[in-house]
Amino acid sequence: RAFALEGDYGGCEQVNRYIHGGEGTAQEAAAAIGFSIYRTEEMAELISYMRQYNESALEGEDLRFYGFDMQRLSYSMRFLKESCKELEVDTTNLQKLVEGENWSSECDLSTRTETLTQVKKELESKNGSENAIHFVDILMQHSELQTLTNDDGATLRDQFMAENVQWILQQEQRNGHEKIFVTGHNSHVAKWGSFDSMGKLLSKDAANGYYVIGTDFYKTHCNMPTRSPEKRTIQVFYSHDPLAKAAKLAGFDIC
């Protein structure tokens, strides 16, 4: 039972560890996902439920939490370093790539790619290194994404997300699970669009095996952060989709 979210891969691994008995709180786990939209009571409640469910789940029937985005650095780098130490792979050059939660200004794309490629080669010679190798892939995706403009970056991000969803599915299939649940914004999961979205790429590979349920609204209230990190505000939004308005006028109050 795999739940894959449009959230940072490393941050979602932190959630996965929490729901399997790891330290911290559900709120801290939700914050690790990376986007402010997930720092809600509802997400914390979902994570708490998953942890509670796993406490009594049969072996192989536990809930697993994945992320397929690559826009954050810190958690993936932290877990990669941990894995390297466990597998006795030197992290000296890896340490030089980062300053705090960002790439070091002294290391350009070429340097980062060279270092990460070398680490990946060393990991490939080790048994049980598959998850560590994927952390390298996520970091290489993040590194490349930082060098691109908005339009090019958006297209590449969806390509990377599609690749990451495929990787997640492969991990699950090896354990006898043929289906995963993927959630993300409509523009990413949709099979159609003006560019090669994640959903369009996945539907080409999976054909009828990729099933999408899109959601929309006519009017909604949204609790959003202001420029001050400690303050939030309630904003009202209306959908531009005529079908959403038609549903509202037809009496579907949920819209």
Predicted regions and their residues:
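Structural recognition of the beta-strand scaffold that forms the well-ordered cores
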Residues: A2-E6, R64-G67, K179-T183, Y211-G214
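The substrate-binding groove and active-site-proximal loops of carbohydrate-active enzymes
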Residues: A29-E41, W103-S104, S110, N150-L156
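C-terminal regions of proteins
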Residues: T155, V189-C255
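Trp/Phe/Arg-rich N-terminal binding region typifying the photolyase-homology
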Residues: R1-S56
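Alpha/beta-hydrolase fold catalytic core
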Residues: S129-I180, S187
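Flexible loop/turn segments at secondary-structure boundaries
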Residues: G10-E13, R72-Y75, S187-W192, K219-N223
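Short secondary-structure boundary/capping segments
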Residues: R17-E23, R78-L87, S194-G199, P225-I234
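Long, well-ordered, tryptophan-enriched scaffold segments
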Residues: E45, Y49-Q52, S56-G67, Q71-D152
